[in-house]
């Protein structure tokens, strides 16, 4: 567990930064994402570690058939005991949600500041067009959204790989469509929901 300490210091430093440019924030988040990937590899390689969780859910809908969700969580030594006896709060630093429905697959990754639960970064890869980009048509969409340390929207990028293999950047169109306040509310509310599921499961083992 000692290897977590440098990582904790790294994350903590992320929360005390003053105002910064979008470029600086993007660079910072990319470093944090790389750190998270390293931590996840450690968690996966060590079967006795108790800081990861895998949840699967299936439900049938008449119109679209079977919907299949998988949610993975990775958290370090960040648990805090609540005033209620025996109730603990864990703050995952990373969550991955995979959604499969009607032969379409969407995978979304959430990078989370574990001390505060604030959203840092969202990456979505999907066979379906996000944010109503239906005019582009079929393709594989990769959406990235970056957030400041207080959880407010910073910037984003969107790339689509078309069936012929060509790529198209939709960065300007994406940032024109996204209203920062809506982005803040939608994504941060969903991350809080994911964390609540995680903590419910951890406290009901």
Say what each PLM segment does.
Residues 4-15:
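Sec-dependent N-terminal signal peptides
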Residues 21-205:
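Buried hydrophobic residues that stabilize the cores of well-folded domains
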